[in-house]
Regions:
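Intrinsically disordered, low-complexity Ser/Thr- and acidic-rich flexible linkers and loops
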Residues: 42-57, 283, 287-288, 294-296
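Catalytic pocket-lining loop regions of alpha/beta-barrel enzymes
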Residues: 114-226, 274-296
Length: 297
């Protein structure tokens, strides 16, 4: 099976270690979202630099380097602030990279929240549409506000991040009702991500996720659902292998459902064809002078 993980912060563990885990558990490709953590202002996420006016511009040098070195295994997305004063020019620069597959916006902070609710993300979404880039949107507790944008930009592919769940909800108490309501829009897709962290109270294989997975599948259909482990952030609840095999062994999903959600949807929506030749498993303990074998769980 051609498996694509549609978001990993691989810069946290390094490209070599990421590849070793991918090889070990059978993942062909990863969409990298470079992330280090929050800045002093927790609504701003690093790596980024501050622009005049206090807006942060995210960057992803390690993500792009991984994609350049291993184009069959990695591509990347870039976070973009809707408040960036040079938004149009910045998106044009980003879109020139052959390995950029999507933009992502994270609606944190009072200014971003107010702008999102008031239609202030039009310029960002217009730029994404102009360059043919899908738009990943993280907007916890504000998912219904995405609906007007989906109507206004019917030819832009939106992807709801992290199941649309509220980050601060007690574990296993977050709901996806607002998210599945947006399945009425044919240009809105869902990333099934962080589900063990936000939606489950049980240990692996997280059987309490199955009714919610079925709810999402019935609403969106398999052609508009993609899987994401977000491994480096969610590993307190599930190892990378557990996040994957929860899906591979799900009794709710048919074999065709799994093929779409675990790879084909991402390939289609991100315009990222599968490589002609699948990866070959590399040794788990490569011999590197003075180097130790990578460790992972």
């Amino acid at each position: 099976m051609d498996i694509v993980d549609s978001q990993v912060h691989s810069n946290v563990i390094g490209t070599d270690t990421t590849l070793a885990i991918m090889d070990a558990i059978g993942i062909q490709s990863v969409l990298v979202d470079e992330y280090l953590g929050p800045a002093e202002n927790p609504s701003q996420l690093l790596p980024a630099y501050e622009l005049p006016g206090g807006v942060f511009r995210p960057i992803g040098p390690n993500a792009e380097a991984a994609a350049l070195a291993h184009p069959d295994r990695f591509a990347f997305l870039m976070r973009v602030s809707a408040l960036d004063p040079r938004l149009d020019g910045w998106v044009e620069v980003l879109a020139a990279s052959p390995h950029l597959k999507a933009l992502r916006t994270v609606v944190f902070g009072d200014r971003e929240v107010a702008a999102f609710k008031e239609g202030g993300f039009d310029r960002l979404f217009a730029a994404a549409r102009r360059h043919g880039l899908p738009m990943f949107v993280t907007c916890p507790r504000m998912v219904p506000h995405l609906g007007p944008y989906a109507r206004k930009f019917p030819d832009l592919q939106f992807v709801i991040d992290h199941c649309g769940a509220a980050f601060e909800a007690p574990r296993g108490r977050a709901l996806i009702d607002d998210t599945v309501a947006l399945a009425e829009y044919s240009n809105v897709a869902l990333k099934w991500a962080h589900a063990p962290s936000f939606l489950s109270n049980q240990p692996y294989p997280f059987p309490d996720l199955e009714p919610l997975l079925a709810q999402a599948l019935n609403a969106f259909g398999r052609e508009l659902m993609m899987w994401e482990s977000d491994y480096t952030v969610s590993r307190h609840r599930a190892s990378w292998a557990e996040a994957l095999f929860t899906m591979r062994h799900s009794p709710v999903l048919s074999a065709d459902d799994k093929a779409w959600i675990l790879g084909r949807t991402a390939r289609n929506l991100l315009n990222w064809p599968a490589p002609e030749k699948p990866f070959s498993r590399r040794p788990l303990h490569p011999h590197r002078p003075g180097g130790a074998a990578p460790k992972f769980d």
